[in-house]
Amino acid sequence: MMEPPKPEPELQRFYHRLLRPLSLFPTRTTSPEPQKRPPQEGRILQSFPLAKLTVASLCSQVAKLLAGSGIAAGVPPEARLRLIKVILDELKCSWREPPAELSLSHKNNQKLRKRLEAYVLLSSEQLFLRYLHLLVTMSTPRGVFTESATLTRLAASLARDCTLFLTSPNVYRGLLADFQALLRAEQASGDVDKLHPVCPAGTFKLCPIPWPHSTGFAQVQCSNLNLNYLIQLSRPPEFLNEPGRMDPVKELKSIPRLKRKKPFHWLPSIGKKREIDISSSQMVSLPSYPVAPTSRASPSPFCPELRRGQSMPSLREGWRLADELGLPPLPSRPLTPLVLATESKPELTGLIVAEDLKQLIKKMKLEGTRYPPLDSGLPPLLGVVTRHPAAGHRLEELEKMLRNLQEEEASGQWDPQPPKSFPLHPQPVTITLKLRNEVVVQAAAVRVSDRNFLDSFHIEGAGALYNHLAGELDPKAIEKMDIDNFVGSTTREVYKELMSHVSSDHLHFDQGPLVEPAADKDWSTFLSSAFLRQEKQPQIINPELVGLYSQRANTLQSNTKKMPSLPSLQATKSWEKWSNKASLMNSWKTTLSVDDYFKYLTNHETDFLHVIFQMHEEEVPVEIVAPARESLEIQHPPPLLEDEEPDFVPGEWDWNTVLEHRLGAGKTPHLGEPHKILSLQKHLEQLWSVLEVPDKDQVDMTIKYSSKARLRQLPSLVNAWERALKPIQLREALLARLEWFEGQASNPNRFFKKTNLSSSHFLEENQVRSHLHRKLNLMESSLVSLLEEIELIFGEPVIFKGRPYLDKMKSDKVEMLYWLQQQRRVRHLVSALKDPHQSTLFRSSAASL
């Protein structure tokens, strides 16, 4: 008989038991659903006020929680109390209870308060455990800072983190936003799984540093905290569970088939060590899941055979949650799902701890051999600097020297003074030379003194090119060898001589006179515009060539003599010169030839450097013969006696001297007859009128020369002034002509006016101006010396219109041009006032002036 079929639930349990090891997710225990409260109970709760989160209640709860956390850590009690005090002080100073949210119900407000309380407790514990871990890891024997300094730094950092994660306004805003999101997800069906955090719960609680730890406790937060992580960690338990998984049978069917047509060819040179390095580098690159390998098995020896290909990498390798918590590993995945019963394997916790201890001891041995322990009690930082292995050789030498000195001092043979060496005899330095006829000679330097050098030195000399003592080379060969140096020295001498004639003060503009005198030559005759109205004449570059041909020389000399020197002679008729035009052209064509030119080049020097640098022979300058002038000898007045000389004060008249002369009995006048005094007075008045002397100066001269002592000097003064009067009148006449000419020719606006004048009009103006200036310069040279001599002899200058004429000569030309320009401006202003329509035009022209 056939057995009855088994019920379907038994088969499902059997298949589940077989496929459970193949699942990638651990089993989930279903939590019992909380019983729903009746709506009446919620209405009753709304009538009660919300429980307040006071500072005292929070501090008491946090203190109780932290007192039992991290007990396994090897930390002094003072350090634990210090960290707990920092957290409690931050809560006491900065905690503010948030108000009730109007948008939430009474029940939701209570949940929010519980959520906030849970967040504060959880965050305080996380911060406390993290800084306990940092205190343990940083307080090492080889640390640079002391334990107290390390604790102070960690306390300051903990206070900052407490401000960020406990009492900051961002904490409550983040909690409220997350709480409202959970409420919306709870109302919507199937959205609870979407709020699951990106990383699994408890990931950030674990330490990413590979085990074994020296802290003494397992669950320690040593990575950087995050506000979002702490907010997600404070969610209710139902939101922290993993999402529902698929049915194992459906999960098994969804696995795709493997493609084994293209197997992976593993190279034989890749060992297990290479795989471990690659896996460790991949794990370091993941910031959210820092893991480390847990397999402690010894590496297998290298096998040259090809390794088998794997369908997928093992996801169980690396640092896992079970390794952190010290739990036994999960059962290994079987090769076939047909496993009727699971084998129980012994726990490997003890083996892992033993291997950790072995590796710790091994590391301590390696560190001890690499860095020897310090014998002195110096701080670690100073010990590292002074006990570096590179300074070991120097320390050994110093210790050896110290031992020798101690031995000598103990034996009594130690002498504070070093042993004196015997004086050396002076020896000259000799050099051995071998001459051409194989004669060896020792040449010694001249010994200046008997001093000896304790430090000897040696200089290797280069071999000699030739020996002049043996006569290996004749003077001609030596001169040929030194021809390059000779040419260079000659060139330097030439340039030195040339540059000595170049002025080095050509850029010093302040050394010359402010006003350059006019040229003595008439440069207008040498301009190209001077030949516009004349026939074209051959230009002579080198006048020495003229002497080769008499006919051409005579012709050119006659032309140069006929050349006018003044612009008035340039307008003369040129019909007389046209008669010799035919003879000039014939001589010009027939006399010049190439042979004559080359003959001239061979007979004369072609170096023009002396012309460029002005090194030609100095020519005697042609002096312009000045017009005959009278001798400058002035009759000196009779000297004054000390008792006769009165004290003259300008503007004051000593009438005693006049009465003394007129009322004195039996006294004769100083000048003889009275008519001479009258004639002298008449001459003086004429001089005053011509020179336009002001009344004040006339009165001063009258007072000065009315005394009997000065009256004898008056005739000499009048004669001297009469001699200076004529040149002054001539100069004033020339200056008046120049003023009239500049009134017409110095207007700057004449260049912008349209006139019918030719282009040579401005050249003629320049010629007239230079002619007048030249005459003034010739006259001023003699007049200045005459006026200076008069002022030197008589002690007072010649006055013209109230000014000393010497001072007037220095600036009257510039003043003349200035007042001419001012007169033009006045005329423009007057014309602008008379014609208001053209006032704008005259304003622009006046501004340009």
UniProtKB/Swiss-Prot annotation:
GO biological-process terms attached to the record: cell differentiation; positive regulation of acrosome reaction; positive regulation of fertilization; single fertilization; spermatogenesis
Keywords of this entry: Coiled coil, Differentiation, Fertilization, Spermatogenesis
InterPro entries documented for this protein: CCDC87
Any coiled-coil regions, as ranges: 387-415
Top-level division of the source organism's lineage: Eukaryota
Function description: Plays a role in spermatogenesis, where it is important for normal sperm head morphology. Also required for the acrosome reaction and thus normal male fertility.
Protein family per UniProt: Belongs to the CCDC87 family.
Name of the protein: Coiled-coil domain-containing protein 87
Species for this entry: Homo sapiens (Human)
Lineage of origin: Eukaryota, Metazoa, Chordata, Craniata, Vertebrata
